[in-house]
């Protein structure tokens, strides 16, 4: 029983990888380098997590994505910051548009599907969630269902994408992650990387970007100790 996880090194994909591991799958994690600012830190976080969990790790380079320009994640455009109380406001939608990378999930999930078919994996686990689904249309269960329809025709082994966190908030994801860490006897959440920036040191977060603020709020609301290193 084999599975692929799309592991960005972030909180959600780390918990999804824990879920796949807990379900007994032989897991291969894939991390994508598409020229994002934090690529080095994300890859190093994913590598550390895979080492702890004893799973195979594949890094796929997608240099052409930078040609899309536009997104603050792959250009020198300023990345917006948000206060915690603004995370559920209209301003969060504007921030989403600033960091949106054209067709990113379409590209990554398509490539992950190719690896899944080649490795005889039946499932691809991804970390889309309720909170980000509000602003990112490719973080919704509707997107997953539509993509799975494509995979019925695009793969011979009918590989299927699983999104076990699609209806969960970040708070619930942190709680679940902490429970799975305890169950599996591992500690990986503190090595996950959510920040949009490369802050010059592995696992070090800026503490100001939208992604960092969502991470901070999640741990705070979950009542789980946040062992993340923040600059602010």
UniProtKB/Swiss-Prot annotation:
SUPFAM superfamilies attached to this UniProt entry: Adenine nucleotide alpha hydrolases-like
Known pathway: Purine metabolism; 7-cyano-7-deazaguanine biosynthesis
MF terms in GO: ATP binding; ligase activity, forming carbon-nitrogen bonds; zinc ion binding
InterPro entries: QueC (IPR018317), Rossmann-like_a/b/a_fold (IPR014729)
UniProt KW keywords: ATP-binding, Ligase, Metal-binding, Nucleotide-binding, Zinc
Residues binding ATP: 7-17
Catalyzed reactions per annotation: 7-carboxy-7-deazaguanine + NH4(+) + ATP = 7-cyano-7-deazaguanine + ADP + phosphate + H2O + H(+)
Cofactor note (record): Binds 1 zinc ion per subunit.
Essential cofactor(s): Zn(2+)
Entry EC no(s): 6.3.4.20
Keyword rRNA-binding: no
Amino-acid positions noted as binding Zn(2+) in the UniProt annotation, renumbered to this chain: 195, 206, 209, 212
Key word tRNA-binding present: no
Matches recorded under Pfam families: QueC
Cited function: Catalyzes the ATP-dependent conversion of 7-carboxy-7-deazaguanine (CDG) to 7-cyano-7-deazaguanine (preQ(0)).
Family: Belongs to the QueC family.
Full protein name: 7-cyano-7-deazaguanine synthase
Organism the protein comes from: Methanocaldococcus jannaschii (strain ATCC 43067 / DSM 2661 / JAL-1 / JCM 10045 / NBRC 100440) (Methanococcus jannaschii)
Lineage of the organism: Archaea, Methanobacteriati, Methanobacteriota, Methanomada group, Methanococci
């Amino acid at each position: 029983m084999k599975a692929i996880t799309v592991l960005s090194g972030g909180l959600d994909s780390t918990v999804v990888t824990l879920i796949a591991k807990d379900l007994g799958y032989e897991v291969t994690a894939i991390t994508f380098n598409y020229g994002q600012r934090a690529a080095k830190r994300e890859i190093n976080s994913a590598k550390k997590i895979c080492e702890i969990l004893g799973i195979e790790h594949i890094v796929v380079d997608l240099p052409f994505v930078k040609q899309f320009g536009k997104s603050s994640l792959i250009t020198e455009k300023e990345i917006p910051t948000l206060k915690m109380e603004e995370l559920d406001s209209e301003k969060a939608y504007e921030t989403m548009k600033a960091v949106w990378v054209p067709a990113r999930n379409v590209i990554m999930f398509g490539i992950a599907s190719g690896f899944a078919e080649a490795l005889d994996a039946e499932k691809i686990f991804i970390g889309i969630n309720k909170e980000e689904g509000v602003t990112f249309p490719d973080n919704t269960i509707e997107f997953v269902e539509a993509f799975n329809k494509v995979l019925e025709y695009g793969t011979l082994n009918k590989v299927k994408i699983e999104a076990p966190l699609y209806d969960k908030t970040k708070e619930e994801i942190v709680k679940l992650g902490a429970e799975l860490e305890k169950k599996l006897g591992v500690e990986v959440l503190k090595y996950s990387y959510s920040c949009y920036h490369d802050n010059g040191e592995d696992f070090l977060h800026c503490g100001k970007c939208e992604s960092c603020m969502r991470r901070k709020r999640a741990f705070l609301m979950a009542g789980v100790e946040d062992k993340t290193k923040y600059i602010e």
